[in-house]
């Protein structure tokens, strides 16, 4: 849908062939007395796309552009689809990766499952997504290189890891 909406579906098949997936199950136990209730610290995903599903215990919060944190109450059958940093770069800065965290406020443990998409090899920014109005903001990049960069001192402390890794201009 994303590729089609930008008219670049011709790149989809080869992109899809290089996609690889990580499925992760997560358990958030209840915080003990005097323990912070932060289940998962503030971050953006380094994936291309993340698909999340949770049990009935809420806790995921998304940061708005105004800096407010919003929680939500998905129906039990909902999946949450979030853009990751690789999609931010691929879309030439059009699709922002969601800044999010998990806060444990309930009385029950929280379980979630996440499917994270990554790509093998170099991700190229479609030339159709760059023009005079939208100058190229990211260089072609190695997605697994981005993951390796993220665990370095520079990558983990950068304001925007993907920008620090392969950015041309300051877009974050
Ligand atoms: O558990 C969740 O809902 C989100 C987990 C998450 O943000 C992550 O694993 O990157
Ligand atoms: Fe995340």
Q: What is the predicted function of each stretch?
A:
Residues 1-172:
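C-terminal flanking tails of non-heme Fe-dependent oxygenases
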């Amino acid at each position: 849908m994303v590729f089609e909406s930008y008219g670049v579906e011709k790149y989809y098949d080869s992109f899809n062939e290089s996609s690889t997936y990580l499925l992760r199950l997560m358990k958030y136990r209840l915080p003990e007395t005097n323990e912070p209730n932060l289940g998962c610290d503030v971050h953006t995903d380094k994936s291309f796309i993340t698909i999340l599903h949770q049990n009935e215990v809420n806790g995921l919060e998304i940061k708005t552009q105004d800096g407010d944190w919003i929680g939500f109450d998905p129906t039990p059958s909902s999946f949450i689809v979030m853009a990751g940093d690789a999609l931010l770069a691929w879309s030439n800065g059009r699709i922002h990766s969601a800044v999010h965290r998990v806060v444990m406020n309930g009385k029950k443990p929280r379980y979630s499952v996440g499917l994270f998409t990554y790509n093998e090899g170099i991700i190229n920014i479609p030339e159709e997504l760059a023009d005079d109005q939208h100058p190229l903001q990211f260089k072609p990049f190695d997605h697994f290189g981005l993951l390796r960069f993220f665990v370095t001192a520079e990558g983990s402390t950068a304001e925007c890891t993907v920008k620090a890794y392969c950015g041309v201009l300051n877009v974050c």
